[in-house]
A protein has these predicted regions:
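Active-site nucleophile and cofactor-binding loops and adjacent substrate-binding regions
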Residues: 9-10, 14, 31-33, 63-69, ...
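Phosphate/pyrophosphate-binding loops at sites that engage ATP/ADP/AMP, CoA/4′-phosphopantetheine
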Residues: 4, 48-58, 246-258
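Short beta-alpha connecting loops at secondary-structure transitions
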Residues: 139-155, 220, 261-262, 277-285, ...
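Single conserved hydrophobic/aromatic residue that forms the stacking wall/gate
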Residues: 2-8, 13, 311-322
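Activation-segment/catalytic-loop signature of the eukaryotic protein kinase fold
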Residues: 193-285
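Glycine-rich phosphate-binding/hydrolytic loop that grips phosphoryl groups
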Residues: 99-103, 154-162, 166-169, 237, ...
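ATP-dependent carbohydrate kinase catalytic cores
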Residues: 38-148, 174-180, 184, 192, ...
Length: 322
């Protein structure tokens, strides 16, 4: 599928295209434009220098709407196809990580949202316009970014996170073991996995490694000393240290990582993973009963006027603090 396409005489980023198919209305948001690198954060306008470089006419940019606002209504064709009510307002759009951050009420500089599914993400809010000169992280306009209130979402992604843990479960751990029991088995190994280290970069090129594809590697195995429990623990420790490597990049950009907000899901269900992450980074980890779909619902609620602003949305339920 093409992620950016021309519709008539206007350009649609993927979320704009979906909204257009639902409503017949073509518009965009600053957040959406920033995902395609079409927004100039320093001057708070469309990135003319990029448009000029590629020879794009400014007329290709669709009407820019506020992130939380009516951006069209579901038309008859889409309603019939999807079983939605015709005329339902479309009032919010964003990517998965801004949605996750919204669900966790992460809005202000220094606040951090994280996930650890197939890939791992650390998403921090920056109050200054700066960047990593090596482009090892992505920067977007966060959901509450505005002229005069810089709120940039800086996204660190580690491709080899839960996918490594699931690979270990399939190929190393005892057959039929649950993730919960696998965590208990890993806890039998000492901190540091008795000298085994695993670099978890086996799921394609890593942005934080400057787009290098190093592959996953396992180091330090002693055939007379190590067993399944050591390898399982080493995998989780390797993932944690890859998080730490990326978090150091974010801190160099001026984003202090002192508290990490995360949903009670995926690898954050592992006591070993979250306790190791807290110990290595020095950050407090808070787990909440929420996910990105809740963030999307809250965003739509703000856009339609159910909530007056971000400060009026409810806090998620905190499950634990590590």
């Amino acid at each position: 599928e093409i992620c950016a396409c021309l519709v008539g005489s206007e350009m649609c980023i993927r979320d704009s295209y979906i909204a257009m198919k639902l409503s017949g209305t073509i518009c965009t948001t600053v957040s959406g434009l920033s995902e395609g690198m079409f927004w100039d954060f320093k001057n708070n306008r469309v990135a003319d220098f990029l448009m000029d470089y590629y020879g794009f006419d400014s007329s290709l940019i669709a009407d820019i709407k506020p992130t939380f606002s009516e951006q069209g209504r579901v038309n008859a064709a889409a309603a019939a196809e999807l079983g939605l009510k015709e005329g339902t307002p479309i009032t919010y759009r964003a990517g998965d990580q801004p949605n996750n951050a919204l669900s966790l009420n992460v809005f202000n500089p220094g606040e951090i949202a994280s996930t650890a599914g197939t890939s791992g993400v650390v998403y921090g809010v920056n109050g200054e316009v700066n960047y990593d000169p090596k482009s090892r992280v992505n920067t977007f306009a966060h959901v509450n970014h505005a002229a005069g209130q810089t709120r940039l979402g800086v996204l660190l992604c580690i491709n080899g996170t839960g996918i490594l843990n699931s690979w270990v479960k399939r190929t190393v751990a005892p057959e039929g073991i649950s993730y919960s029991d696998m965590n208990l088995l890993a806890a039998q190994a000492p901190i540091g996995s008795a000298g085994i280290s695993i670099l978890p970069f086996g799921n394609g090129a890593e942005r934080m490694l400057e787009n290098k594809e190093t592959g996953c590697s396992i180091h330090g195995i002693n055939f007379n000393q190590h067993g399944k429990q050591h390898i399982i623990r080493a995998a989780q420790e390797g993932i944690v240290f890859s998080f730490k490597y990326g978090i150091d990049i974010m801190e160099q950009m001026g984003i202090p990582v002192q508290k990490i907000h995360a949903g009670k899901a995926n690898m954050f269900l592992s006591p070993l993973f979250r306790e190791t992450l807290a110990g290595v980074t020095g950050a407090v980890i808070e787990l909440y009963d929420t996910d990105g779909s809740v963030g999307a619902a809250k965003g739509a609620g703000i856009g339609v006027g159910i909530y007056l602003s971000l400060i009026h949305i409810s806090e998620p339920t905190r499950h634990a603090q590590i």
